[in-house]
């Protein structure tokens, strides 16, 4: 697989808004350092027990820690795909970052409350304890955060709740005031399923024909993804979708001063393109950027070009001075 530099991605964009940084100085450093894997739990002030996985560089640490927050359809695992060079966690850790991925409430090995109690506000409240624990373990005062899809709304709410703990922020495939018209029917179906009595967790169906909504991909990676979702995340909390449609993070966008990158694929079908532009314009932070990765869909983690673009762009933003 060809490794693309962030510079190359930016040059090939159909459009990009950049504020406060020069494209030409972005290095493409080699991935060489060894990493240590850790798995642990954090009991939050909100009463949740959340599982975290960490990848810590054995040497060459840059003194920065980041937290990766998943979206609605799968837990933490797509940040660490164990096939060839698809792991975002490995890539970032080998370049010197302390990398943590959380399993949010309602998912995987973490506490599963009533599914209607899983939303951006409750999850952001949980993550305050997580961010504090990460800061303690890594010896930093602030933690960078990346959130995918509904995880973006979680980050916005977190940036409003405890901005003093958030270093830099990346919103990947995260809607703002509306979702893409192509995704409305599926979102509506999920919301309606959650209205049935006793259905606070609903079937997760989005993964079944995911290859129809991907840029060039490797069969074994897509097969891995489908197997993981089917075996570990076959049900998802019913509270996520109705909350995401309302997006409690909307008021935070214009208020936040946290440096923020909006990162989408050019073939996004969850994020509406004009909505993404509106969010960029409304962002209150003077240090902000929007990058569109050519050919990428919503799940760029499992795409050949998309995974490489995510890795290098994320490293750039989290280490930008």
Positions of the model-derived regions?
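Conserved alpha/beta-hydrolase
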Residues: 86-111
